[in-house]
Amino acid sequence: MRGDSFSMSIENLPDSPMGSRKKKMQIRKVFDKMTEWVTPWRSNLESPREMMILRGDVEQDEFQYASSHCLSSYYSVFVVRLAIMVMLAILIGLLTVLTWHFTRIYTKQSLQTLAYGLRYELLQRPVLRMWSVLNTTSELTTAQVKLSEYVIKKYDKPTTQEELVEMYQAMKDVTWALFASAKALNAITINYRNGFVQAFHRDPASSSTFYIFSDLKNYSISGTGPEDVSGWNNKSIHGNMSAIWYQQQLDPVTGENLGKPLKIPPDDLINIAGISQVPDGEASWHVTVSKYMDSPLLSAALPVFDASNKSIVAVVGVTTALYSVGQLMRDLVEVHGGHIYLTSQEGYLLATSTDGPLLKNTSNGPQLMKATDSEEWVIKSGAQWLEKTYGSKRPHVVHAENVKLGDQRYYIDSFYLNLKRLPIVGVVIIPRKFIMGKVDERAFKTLIILISASVCIFFIGCVCILILTNGVSKEMKLRAELIRQLDARRRAEASSNYKSQFLANMSHELRTPMAAVIGLLDILISDDCLSNEQYATVTQIRKCSTALLRLLNNILDLSKVESGKLVLEEAEFDLGRELEGLVDMFSVQCINHNVETVLDLSDDMPALVRGDSARLVQIFANLISNSIKFTTTGHIILRGWCENINSLHDEMSVSVDRRKPWAPMKTKQVQHRNHLQKSCKNANKMVLWFEVDDTGCGIDPSKWDSVFESFEQADPSTTRTHGGTGLGLCIVRNLVNKMGGEIKVVQKNGLGTLMRLYLILSTPDTVDQNIQPDFSKYGLVVMLSMYGSTARMITSKWLRKHGIATVEASDWNELTQIIRDLLETGSRDNSFDSQHNISDPLRAELSNIVEIKNPVFVIVVDIGVLDLTTNIWKEQLNYLDRFSNKAKFAWLLKHDTSNTVKTELRRKGHVMMVNKPLYKAKMIQILEAVIKNRKRGLCNDLRNRGNGSDESHDCLEIDPTQFDTCSSDDSSETSGEKQVDKSVKPSTLHSPVLKNYLIDATTSNDDSTSASMTQKNPEEEDWKDRLYSGIALDGKNQKSLEGIRILLAEDTPVLQRVATIMLEKMGATVTAVWDGQQAVDSLNYKSINAQAPTEEHKSFEEETANKVTTRETSLRNSSPYDLILMDCQMPKMDGYEATKAIRRAEIGTELHIPIVALTAHAMSSDEAKCLEVGMDAYLTKPIDRKLMVSTILSLTKPSAFQTSLSA
């Protein structure tokens, strides 16, 4: 339809001038309307209300003005086409000019930079080669001087001709050794103070080696000649016609003489260094020539001092040819082009990159040639340009561009090498066309190509614009898309609102009954008539109820996790107890599935950490639950160890005994680790590593990464077999990442899955961490009789690590055999004879135990070792009872162990009972009880105590599930909820009073049983009363609300009863009403009777209209209550309206009754709403008892509240 309207509008355009003007006016009007429509859409797209108005406007324009808008769209598209074409032409033209300009300029600059680098490299290489030659020559000269000084000092002041000859022969030998080892040397000379000369020379023309020396007969033994320059110089050496010079050919390898010495004239001598070359007694360099070579020679001279280091006794000269430098220059020029040459400071050529001569023949023999006289034209012209430009004061470094030599332009660069008395200048001459020739040639071609390409791009662009904009107008498509987007956004916002409202309603509907259940359990726990077993059962029910409440909170946090707005709490908690309580909870399910649950925490784990305990427990609960789901046999191990954050290195690896955690995600984790080390530099942070290892079906390695995604499972059939939504591991990963860690599936040996993760938590500064007791000094011997091999192995390993002798037994027969060998009289002296089937390791362990003096035996027996299917277990108990006076028994009970078995154990005096599984904390408790028993010296058992009442053993069962409520169940529930009371009932094993009571009961004899149980000191009785009460308050605070009058408005009968009992126990006077209307009415009648709501109540509108005046007048006179606890959701009149009515009645008076909100809503917006209507505080259900007391005291008795805080 839209396309038809568009075509009809085009076909019906009038051709007359009037029609043309009308058409233009219509187009202008429509175009203006479109502009007004598009502008607010772009600026106010984020406002939902304006989007609704815009949507209505769009729909109206769509259906009423379709043809007008289509016509306007056609012409607007035509105008846009022309504008785009013009703009494209301008942009392409500018792009062409700018491209040509910047390409030319930047290319030229880049090439010049490269040219400079090339020239610099060409200069540096001869410099390096020259330095190599100089260093080699200098090192050889120094070595020869040191050798000469050593020999001369050895023959200091020879007195006879024989000693002098012997010294010269030694000098010859050491000089030959050095000369033969340095193949690059041309000659080595030694000129002695008495005029004697020794020299070695290589003739490159004939490849011969010669030894040159003067006649020794013409020189005295001691050099009496002058030591200054005037009496001892090079000229005297070469011009001494009276001296007889000899030259003897040598073997180039062995140095042996080849033939007899031959006399030579002085003119044939090589360069011999004299004292004139070392006038100041230091090394010097000079250039010389030889008739044997066509290139200059570089000679170094050093003096040789006598033993006193005061006078010169000889001069050593080392001569090296500069041929290698010239060869390097020629190699460089062949690759890069141009010319390179070296000159002395006076301008004499030393080496060039050409094959031209470097010496010129004169009547006095070969002489050095100046660069300005070179036969090579480029070198000659360059040297003349440098001399003309800079004269005799040439700078050390010269960089010249575009130097015209003849018809070409060159780059000329020079460097300066300063030697002792021999400065050297290097020059590089490169033709400019070698670098910039191609650029200059192609500059014009490049411009033509760019212009042609720009024109082609312009025409192609215009064609593409015409093709792409042809057809239905783009604005029409955008309008339809806009309408769809606005509608989709409206539906998404409505869906989000529905979701939020649903979560809020579910929070109220579920938290209200859960609050009632938990409150009733608290009342039941506070009953002193509960036995220990009943108390444990009720406590476990409360934990499960709190776990359900935590699941509800997880539902509320789901949206926060998805949006990344989840806020973790930062509070101290006992990490070990959290994990122990978690393992205890899951162990019941694992025992039913014949799966062993093991907790293996290292000793260096911190006792207290700071973080969100509820989230941490949620992580491991999901992981362990997932392992239980897929594990049908074997074990599930939760391991934990720690390391300091400053010990993290590049791979974040841990030592081998820490099970080698992987380096998480390589580069990403290295960056993450660097960030953590910087941000936590001054914080007391710890890296806690954990592993959840199971023996289940395992996960395909290809699925190791995908299992952490939302709604992903390793196998599609998992949902049908085991259930689940695939969200558990996703939430775990999000929580782990939120805590600064990572989680990953790693490879393991054997069946099952190994999940490894690390968390970064802080530890308190003032708390002593990991104070481990020393058990090695008490002579303890522990026998572990457990069916589970994994837990038995880990426990025995920990015991042996702490110096406790440990013996393991897996069944009844092995246990009885070990007991007989260790505890029966005479068995320990038989050295475990071979008739018993005992393994060698066990035999060695038993032998070590025999050597322990005064051992204390502790036998930990799994109840499953006994045959409970028949009555044989009683006989087994009777058998073990024979050894009760020699060992202490601790029993591992299952959750379903019958009361008959427990009663029989108590009757036999076995009072140390621990619920499975057994882990380090429980083992420590058992050992501490035994050690305390030994310290007191009480060695009698409790065999006959079974005749007494069962209540005498209620406190003797060692079980954290009975005493420890400081677990995750009482941890913080949500980020918007206050901290729940964690001190309902402290752990008995951490109480010194109960520890004393435990040892007293376990070590009392039969005669003192009744006395010890009846004569309890007041401190113990008071502690036990507080232990078994659901309100863990001090005696002085049990009536902390004494005298406070509280009005309770609650519509749920159970919650009303719970709150009333709770407040009355703390001394408050409570008046309960059923809705907000009765709460407002009760302010007129203090003694109102709370009745259950009936159908006879009038509607809210009728009573409000009739009684509002009376209520407001009465509130102005008096205040019958000190505080009001107001439920927010009630019938007839809710808490919000009731609060508004009360606050309106208080206007004009000095009264202000504190109102505390009670609500099951857990959203942060609910608290703001309560405070906005006039309430003074906000409490969520279930009610935190301590928080409620502190809130009431702060509003009614500020002074008492401050006193309690300071206390």
Curated annotation (Swiss-Prot):
<keyword id="KW-1133">Transmembrane helix</keyword>
<dbReference type="GO" id="GO:0009738">
    <property type="term" value="P:abscisic acid-activated signaling pathway"/>
</dbReference>
<keyword id="KW-0938">Abscisic acid signaling pathway</keyword>
<dbReference type="Pfam" id="PF02518">
    <property type="entry name" value="HATPase_c"/>
</dbReference>
<dbReference type="InterPro" id="IPR004358">
    <property type="entry name" value="Sig_transdc_His_kin-like_C"/>
</dbReference>
<dbReference type="InterPro" id="IPR005467">
    <property type="entry name" value="His_kinase_dom"/>
</dbReference>
<feature type="transmembrane region" description="Helical">
    <location>
        <begin position="447"/>
        <end position="467"/>
    </location>
</feature>
<dbReference type="GO" id="GO:0009927">
    <property type="term" value="F:histidine phosphotransfer kinase activity"/>
</dbReference>
<dbReference type="GO" id="GO:0010431">
    <property type="term" value="P:seed maturation"/>
</dbReference>
<feature type="region of interest" description="Disordered">
    <location>
        <begin position="1000"/>
        <end position="1021"/>
    </location>
</feature>
<dbReference type="InterPro" id="IPR011006">
    <property type="entry name" value="CheY-like_superfamily"/>
</dbReference>
<dbReference type="InterPro" id="IPR050736">
    <property type="entry name" value="Sensor_HK_Regulatory"/>
</dbReference>
<comment type="function">
    <text>Functions as an osmosensor histidine kinase that detects water stress and transmits the stress signal to a downstream MAPK cascade. This protein undergoes an ATP-dependent autophosphorylation at a conserved histidine residue in the kinase core, and a phosphoryl group is then transferred to a conserved aspartate residue in the receiver domain. Positive regulator of drought and salt stress responses, and abscisic acid (ABA) signaling. Confers drought tolerance, probably by regulating levels of ABA accumulation. Plays a redundant role in regulating plant growth and development.</text>
</comment>
<dbReference type="InterPro" id="IPR003661">
    <property type="entry name" value="HisK_dim/P_dom"/>
</dbReference>
<dbReference type="GO" id="GO:0006970">
    <property type="term" value="P:response to osmotic stress"/>
</dbReference>
<feature type="modified residue" description="4-aspartylphosphate">
    <location>
        <position position="1127"/>
    </location>
</feature>
<keyword id="KW-0597">Phosphoprotein</keyword>
<dbReference type="GO" id="GO:0010375">
    <property type="term" value="P:stomatal complex patterning"/>
</dbReference>
<dbReference type="GO" id="GO:0005034">
    <property type="term" value="F:osmosensor activity"/>
</dbReference>
<feature type="modified residue" description="Phosphohistidine; by autocatalysis">
    <location>
        <position position="508"/>
    </location>
</feature>
<comment type="subunit">
    <text>Interacts with AHP2, depending of the phosphorylation state of Asp-1075 in the receiver domain, but probably not with AHP1 and AHP3.</text>
</comment>
<feature type="compositionally biased region" description="Low complexity">
    <location>
        <begin position="1000"/>
        <end position="1014"/>
    </location>
</feature>
<keyword id="KW-0472">Membrane</keyword>
<dbReference type="InterPro" id="IPR036097">
    <property type="entry name" value="HisK_dim/P_sf"/>
</dbReference>
<feature type="compositionally biased region" description="Polar residues">
    <location>
        <begin position="1"/>
        <end position="10"/>
    </location>
</feature>
<keyword id="KW-1003">Cell membrane</keyword>
<feature type="compositionally biased region" description="Basic and acidic residues">
    <location>
        <begin position="975"/>
        <end position="984"/>
    </location>
</feature>
<dbReference type="Pfam" id="PF00072">
    <property type="entry name" value="Response_reg"/>
</dbReference>
<feature type="topological domain" description="Cytoplasmic">
    <location>
        <begin position="1"/>
        <end position="81"/>
    </location>
</feature>
<keyword id="KW-0902">Two-component regulatory system</keyword>
<dbReference type="GO" id="GO:0000155">
    <property type="term" value="F:phosphorelay sensor kinase activity"/>
</dbReference>
<dbReference type="InterPro" id="IPR036890">
    <property type="entry name" value="HATPase_C_sf"/>
</dbReference>
<feature type="region of interest" description="Disordered">
    <location>
        <begin position="964"/>
        <end position="987"/>
    </location>
</feature>
<dbReference type="GO" id="GO:0005886">
    <property type="term" value="C:plasma membrane"/>
</dbReference>
<feature type="topological domain" description="Extracellular">
    <location>
        <begin position="103"/>
        <end position="446"/>
    </location>
</feature>
<feature type="domain" description="Response regulatory">
    <location>
        <begin position="1045"/>
        <end position="1196"/>
    </location>
</feature>
<dbReference type="GO" id="GO:0009414">
    <property type="term" value="P:response to water deprivation"/>
</dbReference>
<keyword id="KW-0812">Transmembrane</keyword>
<keyword id="KW-0808">Transferase</keyword>
<keyword id="KW-0418">Kinase</keyword>
<feature type="domain" description="Histidine kinase">
    <location>
        <begin position="505"/>
        <end position="763"/>
    </location>
</feature>
<feature type="topological domain" description="Cytoplasmic">
    <location>
        <begin position="468"/>
        <end position="1207"/>
    </location>
</feature>
